[in-house]
A protein has these predicted regions:
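Feature captures hydrophobic
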Residues: 60-217
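Binuclear metal-ion centers of metallo-dependent hydrolases, dominated by the metallo-beta-lactamase
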Residues: 1-82
Length: 217
């Protein structure tokens, strides 16, 4: 693979609303940082492969090798100030929802688990890791990753297992997620830092999270 041009990618979004307080703890780089990294890489022949960085909505002509605009670097301080003054005050859509009851989730869980388990089988994935999702009334949804049936348990049941993933999020958002992707989606909620994870051991399992994205109607 010998491209004439390459473009680095970096997530340029910021957290708004209540979760904006987590922005400083989020692993992130600016597009400028990614471009500088590749521009200074000794493994790239910069005479043959040229890095390209563009403003939003600008155009790059592959024939001439030029953009229609001069790139303007991100002003990090201005970006932080705008997020603090404006974005942090935004409300999430789900914050206007009525707080759901335990019964609201009990109606959804069987079908959601069915989809989760189908994806787990498709991935040919089985694990001793137990997934616990926090529910109203101090209950937890226990989802085994090995094909066993799901259960509604109390929080103290977590202590019975050595390998687990505990998931906590706003019940209103959780109800939207489990109601289906047209309302909200696990992956988007995770990227936006709306979900808290507690793992034992502290190991990220891609297969668990892939299957988890199908825990919805």
């Amino acid at each position: 693979f010998q491209p004439d041009f390459y473009m680095p990618f970096a997530g340029r979004y910021v957290l708004g609303g209540e979760k904006s307080k987590l922005e400083k703890k989020r692993a992130k780089i600016e597009l400028d940082d990614a471009f500088d990294y590749f521009s200074n890489s000794s493994t790239i022949n910069h005479e043959l492969h040229k890095g390209v960085i563009l403003n939003q909505n600008s155009i790059f002509d592959l024939t001439t090798g030029k953009s229609n605009q001069k790139y303007i670097p991100v002003d990090k301080e201005q970006k932080r100030n705008y997020a603090r003054a404006h974005l942090s005050k935004l409300k999430y859509d789900y914050e206007t929802d009525k707080l759901p009851s335990l019964e609201d989730f009990l109606v959804l869980i069987p079908k959601c688990f069915e989809r989760f388990n189908a994806k787990r089988k498709q991935l040919n994935f089985s694990s001793n890791t137990q997934i616990f999702i926090t529910l109203p009334e101090n209950k937890m949804l226990r989802i085994p990753s090995n094909g066993e049936a799901h259960q509604i348990v109390s929080k103290k049941n977590i202590e019975e297992f050595d390998r687990y993933l505990v998931i906590t999020t706003d019940f209103r958002l959780l109800l939207r997620i489990m109601s289906g992707p047209k309302f909200a989606h696990w992956n988007n909620a995770e990227i936006g830092c709306h979900i808290e994870f507690n793992r034992s051991p502290n190991y990220y399992s891609p297969d668990v999270h892939t299957a988890l994205q199908f825990l919805h109607l």
